[in-house]
Amino acid sequence: MVPMHLLGRLEKPLLLLCCASFLLGLALLGIKTDITPVAYFFLTLGGFFLFAYLLVRFLEWGLRSQLQSMQTESPGPSGNARDNEAFEVPVYEEAVVGLESQCRPQELDQPPPYSTVVIPPAPEEEQPSHPEGSRRAKLEQRRMASEGSMAQEGSPGRAPINLRLRGPRAVSTAPDLQSLAAVPTLEPLTPPPAYDVCFGHPDDDSVFYEDNWAPP
């Protein structure tokens, strides 16, 4: 089969030869009557070129329609690959890993949230002998129990993380800081001092007024 680019190159030469043959035949018919066979020959040759031109045009139109139909029926491997990627369903493991990464966006270097931290109560090695120590221990146990319940309510599906500090606890030597639970003692209120106010001479504005003072 003749390729399409070759058919496109044959169109213009065939059309040019057809027009030239028709013009030459008509010119010979008008000039002299004794050369009529030659004029008919050029007219016939122009008709042949015209037929060849129309045949080339028809073949070109047929090839274009055939290529368009082939492209519509089979878009090609690239189009099929794009369609497969668009309608591809991920594997169950990939979907689960993606959901877990979306639910936990924090990095590994960052500490866990406060709701997942549970501080266990300290082991009871020895019972305090004085009432202030027992009261402080009860307050600490109550605070740790409330924090543990808040952590369990905030994240039921996550395992608790123990972030208890290791090592001995630092105890303050100041007496005010040792007994935090004790009620502070209040200082007695001192009454204001008494002032002697004299209303004997209300119209006198002198600040040097005295009872035994006499004008000179």
From Swiss-Prot:
This is Transmembrane protein 139. Residues 1-25 form the signal peptide. May be involved in cellular trafficking of proteins such as SLC4A1. The modification Phosphoserine is found at residues 146, 155. One of its GO terms (cellular component) is membrane. Residues 127-145 have a biased composition (Basic and acidic residues). It is found in: Membrane.
